[in-house]
Amino acid sequence: MAKGKDVRIRVILECNSCVRNDLNKESPGISRYITQKNRHNTPSRLELRKFCPYCYKHTIHGEIKK
């Protein structure tokens, strides 16, 4: 018996430094992760520090729109 919108939604996290480097064509790709967040606990955009295989280091991954 779901009421309206679900509380937990699927979000896509994208590497912020790869996005900046992609404009200059320095990066071979853009790292993306798929995760879930609780809409009530975190109404703002999610930012997590995750490993980027293209930058070879841990970077900030921010939530993007679908």
Swiss-Prot record:
Coiled coil: none annotated. It comes from the Eukaryota. GO terms for cellular component: chloroplast; ribonucleoprotein complex; ribosome. GO terms for biological process: translation. It is found in: Plastid, Chloroplast. Its main location: plastid. Keywords: Chloroplast, Plastid, Ribonucleoprotein, Ribosomal protein. Pfam families: Ribosomal_L33. One of its GO terms (molecular function) is structural constituent of ribosome. Belongs to the bacterial ribosomal protein bL33 family. HAMAP family: Ribosomal_bL33 (MF_00294). This is Large ribosomal subunit protein bL33c.
